[in-house]
């Protein structure tokens, strides 16, 4: 029976596993997906082989010292998010965008060369393979006499494991919605879990690759904000690689579209 079971192979779960490994403490990690990293996910563009982050992209050394130290300790190269140039705003559909007075958007943010998924790969490489279990979806958490019983769905069957300690490195809202607890959690805790927002959970990302960063050549930063009622991509940013040779623009795409009016395109010329 392992001393500690970690449920969730995102950044939080991996960081805890790495810490326990460095201390020589026993642990086993279970992840529902068939990959580690959680919402950290990088994909290669077919157009120019650029590694783009479809999940977390940036870190801020001034305000996130722990993750900064971890990235540096793993020997990962980083670069500053490109913010130099004009920042645009489009308020109406039939006018040209205006130049904003802002001088930067991302406030000293940096990115990992090759995509943020390199952080996940580097962390996972330091952990024993036999302690990492993919494809295990947590179903229930049951309190035993002096241990905890966890039930997972794995390959269309239910697997039970016991541990002295359990760390649930998952969004509280997902735990409350999908995991059965015995004894049940009290009402106030369940309410708090339901009310805990998962940062950026209602946003998706779109990345478009180009042959060259034409916006930089014209003195623009790549940052733009679209605020009119037919907006599809409200915030756009430069997503090029560290050299600027692999060109791309990224954008946030709100997943909740029920509040926005339907898009009605004008007649397009033939």
Language-model-derived ranges and their functions:
Residues 1-270:
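FAD-dinucleotide binding site
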């Amino acid at each position: 029976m392992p001393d500690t079971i970690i449920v969730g192979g995102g950044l939080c779960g991996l960081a805890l596993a790495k810490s326990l490994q460095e201390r020589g403490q026993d642990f086993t990690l279970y992840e529902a997906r068939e990959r580690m990293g959680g919402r950290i996910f990088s994909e290669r563009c077919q157009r120019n082989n650029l590694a783009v982050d479809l999940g977390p992209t940036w870190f801020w050394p001034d305000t996130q010292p722990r993750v900064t130290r971890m990235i540096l300790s793993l020997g990962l190269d980083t670069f500053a998010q490109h913010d130099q140039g004009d920042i645009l705003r489009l308020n109406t559909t039939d006018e040209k965008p205006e130049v904003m007075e802002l001088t930067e958007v991302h406030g000293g943010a940096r990115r990992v060369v090759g995509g943020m998924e390199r952080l996940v790969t580097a962390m996972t490489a330091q952990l024993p393979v036999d302690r990492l279990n993919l494809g295990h979806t947590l179903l229930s958490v049951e309190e035993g006499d002096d241990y905890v019983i966890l039930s997972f769905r794995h390959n269309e069957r239910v697997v039970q494991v016991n541990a002295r300690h359990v760390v649930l490195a998952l969004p509280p809202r997902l735990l409350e919605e999908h995991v059965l607890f015995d004894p049940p959690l009290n009402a106030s805790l369940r309410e708090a879990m339901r009310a805990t927002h998962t940062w950026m959970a209602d946003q998706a990302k779109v990345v478009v690759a180009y042959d060259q960063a034409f916006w930089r050549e014209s003195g623009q930063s790549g940052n733009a904000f679209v605020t009119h009622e037919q907006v599809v991509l409200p915030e756009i940013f430069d997503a090029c690689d560290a050299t600027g040779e692999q060109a791309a623009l990224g954008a946030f795409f709100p997943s909740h579209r029920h509040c926005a009016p339907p898009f009605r395109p004008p007649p397009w010329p033939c």
